Each structure stands twice: as C-alpha cells, then as structure tokens.
Amino acid sequence: MRPLDIVELAEPEEVEVLEPEEDFEQFLLPVINEMREDIAALSREHGRAYLRNRSKLWEMDNMLIQIKTQVEASEESALNHLQNPDDGAEGRGTKRCEKAEEKAKEIAKMAEMLVELVRRIEKSESS
C-alpha cells in the first residue's frame, strides 16, 4: 500500500443545510404519515385475522358436535339392535345386512367429516 497524497483527497461537497422546519416538512412528515397509515392497516388486518380464526374455530366446533351426535346416535342404534334382536329367522339375515350397510354408510360419512375437519385444521394452521 502506498500512502495517500494530499492531492488525491477529494474536497468535501457542500451540502445544503435545511432549516429544521423545512427538514421536518420535507422529509419526516411524509414518513410519519406513511407509518401511521401502515399501523392503521396492520391494526385492521389484525382484527380481521382474529375474526377469521374465531369463525374457523366455531365452524370446526360445530362439525365436531355433528360428528359426536352421529356417533352417539349410531351407538344407541347398535345398542338397541343388540337388546331387541329380530325374532324371525328368515328376515333376520336380510335385516342385519341392511343395518350393516346403513352403519357402513354412517361410518363412511363420519370418516369424511373427520377428514374434512383435519384438512380445515391443517389449512388454518398453515395460514
């Protein structure tokens, strides 16, 4: 490295110094106003996000209540079937098949609702 020559040093440029009032009005005031707008927009979005999340939770809660109600009804139906078996030997097989198909449909519907609930939970966690 070689030492710097005094000639190589650049003369400092003169910068126009503004009065404090002009500086505030020209530079700081627009920035402050923009920051206020950003804060207001963020506050509004925060409120909307809270309401969206609350709505999703209510929706999931209602879906869980529906699933619980269907499971309880299915259990009750199965218990009633066990307590009151059909007396006819011929019709017993066909009725049991019909009831088994009905239960399979109910279980499939509950499974679909559970899958939908899990998807909504995953979707709400990702957003």
UniProtKB/Swiss-Prot annotation:
Gene Ontology cellular-component terms listed: nucleus; perinuclear region of cytoplasm
Main location: nucleus
Database matches in Pfam families: MRFAP1
Coiled-coil stretches: 92-126
InterPro entries: MRFAP1 (IPR029254)
Domain of life: Eukaryota
Subcellular location(s) of the protein: Nucleus; Cytoplasm, Perinuclear region
Region feature Disordered, mapped onto this chain: 76-97
Alphabetized UniProt keyword annotations: Coiled coil, Cytoplasm, Nucleus
Subunit relationships: Found in a complex composed of MORF4L1, MRFAP1 and RB1. Interacts via its N-terminus with MORF4L1. Interacts with CSTB and MORF4L2.
Sequence similarity: Belongs to the MORF4 family-associated protein family.
PANTHER family in UniProt: MORF4 FAMILY-ASSOCIATED PROTEIN 1 (PTHR31324:SF1), MORF4 FAMILY-ASSOCIATED PROTEIN 1-RELATED (PTHR31324)
This protein's name: MORF4 family-associated protein 1
Organism of this sequence: Bos taurus
High-level lineage: Eukaryota, Metazoa, Chordata, Craniata, Vertebrata
The encoding gene: MRFAP1
